[in-house]
Amino acid sequence: DGAVDALVHTARRTGFRGRWEQVSENPRVICDIGHNEHGLKYNFTQLKRMLESGEISKLIVLYGSVADKDVDAAVRLFPDNATYIFTRAQGKRAMPAEEVRGKYLALCAEDGRPVAQTYCCETVADAGRLAYQLVESCEKAGALPADVLIYVGGSTYVVSEFLAIKA
């Protein structure tokens, strides 16, 4: 289909990065700059399907947002069976990681959802290091690196900082 082809090849054609971009295979790392409810709904639906199908056994979400986005709507879309690392990008518009975590915990309490394992990191670099440490812990517990997925998203700024660290 033409739309799928356009999305898949956008990065190569334009140099534009961060749209469902797999930046690593072992462990698998996918970055996506989707930051509104529509984009995040698509992303989190894909991640839920990957977990449910057994394509991955462990999901680690590295997530940050800017303060003017509807984080309450975003956290409603989060998969229940993931580990969350909340972070903030550099810049004045970034929402503090603890505030994003607080919104997630409030939603869980309000909706009776199970609370996932959560962490907060003040920088994207620290969040990235923690994500890779969690992958190592999964491997020590018997998971294969290909069974673990790190998803980086919530903000163009978070993805950009992560990609700069990976470069």
Feature locations, PLM:
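Nucleotide phosphate-binding/pyrophosphate-handling subdomain across enzymes
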Residues: 1-83
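C-terminal helical cap/extension that packs against the catalytic core
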Residues: 28-29, 74-148
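Short glycine-/acidic-enriched loop or helix-start segments at secondary-structure transitions
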Residues: 40-41, 71-73, 96-97, 161-164
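Alpha-helical structural signal in soluble globular domains
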Residues: 46, 50, 77, 103-110, ...
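Short, hydrophobic alpha-helical segments
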Residues: 47-51, 131, 135-139, 166
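Acidic, glycine-rich flexible loop segments
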Residues: 152
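Active-site-proximal loop/hinge segments that shape catalytic or ion-binding/gating pockets
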Residues: 155
